[in-house]
């Protein structure tokens, strides 16, 4: 498939596969965890599955958000709990009436996977298919994923250069014993620590924040020292997200799809340490990047002077047809609020 596509097409090839072997990642392949069941325990298993798979050198992975198999009381009538050998931690059987909660939690997890895709045998599978409350939450995370595309696409560039996955187990960044045992948290690039909710009815969960860094609650701006367990709030619309202090996160403007280029990019800086981030851009469609047709921009934060520069130049600037950093948002973790530093356009 890859050879034929390269020979005949100018645009990039993407292959979705569930069969993997060493070296398959060089053929534009993303993998998924097969036709999984819509169960809470199955959602829980997706996290270690993803981390082990990505650690093997296959950086692009996904799952069928919400599960692929039909619900037992809708299409098939099959009782498939027996196939899971009674491993569900809550014993709650997912049915049509309570499925929306599982779908929301799976969707939140999927928004921080290398490949974000929803799929299944359900007749309706749009964000508005599960009620108004669910729609509002799903749209929130869909917009969040799109806003992070400058960050995510730049991570993909680093993966191409180094082979290191950007969805990775905590021990890859923090080689400590506590992190080596964790299977339900992960890093999404150098900045984000993600702690998905995988229990029915759960509104808070324990989260370990690794030592060697300070951490900031993405939703509240609250600052935490590393090397400790905390009890994080996890209401239905909230997946616990923590940002490593000393991070730069490029954020794109709202778009309905990636067919629309994000021409306005702002920087969100989480102070606490000197840091840098390489922003990457190409045409997003062809293989011209293999010929060197791409651009990078080195963003650097000096924590002492509280100054952000790009390739050593003060912001804002025009780069690759984009207006970069007309606004720099520095997260004030001491006062638990955001401080907007607006540069002169």
Regions found by a protein language model. Name each.
Residues 238-340, 344:
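Accessory, solvent-exposed terminal regions and/or long lumenal/extracellular loops of proteins
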Residues 230, 344-345:
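A short, sequence-level motif marking secondary-structure junctions
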């Amino acid at each position: 498939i890859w050879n034929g596509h390269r020979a005949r097409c100018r645009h990039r090839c993407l292959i979705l596969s569930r069969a993997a072997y060493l070296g398959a990642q060089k053929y534009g392949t993303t993998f998924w965890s097969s036709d999984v069941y819509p169960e809470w325990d199955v959602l829980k298993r997706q996290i270690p599955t993803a981390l082990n798979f990505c650690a093997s050198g296959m950086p692009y992975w996904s799952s069928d958000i919400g599960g692929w198999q039909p619900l037992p009381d809708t299409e098939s009538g099959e009782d498939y709990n027996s196939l899971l050998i009674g491993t569900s931690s809550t014993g709650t059987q997912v049915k049509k009436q309570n499925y929306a909660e599982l779908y929301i939690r799976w969707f939140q997890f999927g928004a921080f996977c290398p490949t974000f895709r929803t799929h299944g045998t359900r007749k309706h599978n749009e964000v508005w298919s599960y009620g108004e409350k669910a729609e509002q939450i799903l749209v929130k995370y869909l917009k969040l994923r799109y806003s992070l595309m400058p960050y995510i696409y730049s991570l993909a560039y680093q993966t191409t250069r180094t082979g290191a996955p950007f969805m990775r187990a905590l021990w890859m960044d923090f080689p400590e014993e506590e992190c080596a045992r964790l299977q339900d948290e992960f890093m999404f690039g150098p900045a984000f620590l993600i702690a998905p909710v995988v229990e029915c009815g759960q509104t808070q969960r324990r989260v370990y924040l690794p030592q060697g860094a300070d951490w900031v609650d993405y939703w509240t701006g609250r600052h935490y020292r590393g090397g400790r367990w905390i009890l994080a709030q996890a209401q239905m619309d909230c997946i616990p997200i923590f940002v490593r202090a000393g991070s730069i996160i490029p954020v794109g403007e709202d778009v309905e799809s990636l067919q629309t280029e994000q021409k306005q990019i702002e920087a969100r800086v989480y102070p606490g340490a000197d840091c840098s981030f390489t922003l990457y851009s190409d045409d997003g469609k062809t293989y011209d990047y293999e010929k060197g047709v791409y651009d990078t921009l080195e963003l650097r934060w000096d924590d002492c002077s509280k100054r952000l520069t790009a390739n050593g130049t003060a912001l804002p600037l025009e780069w690759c047809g984009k207006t970069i950093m007309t606004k720099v948002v520095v997260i004030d973790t001491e006062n638990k609020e955001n401080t907007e530093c607006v540069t002169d356009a």
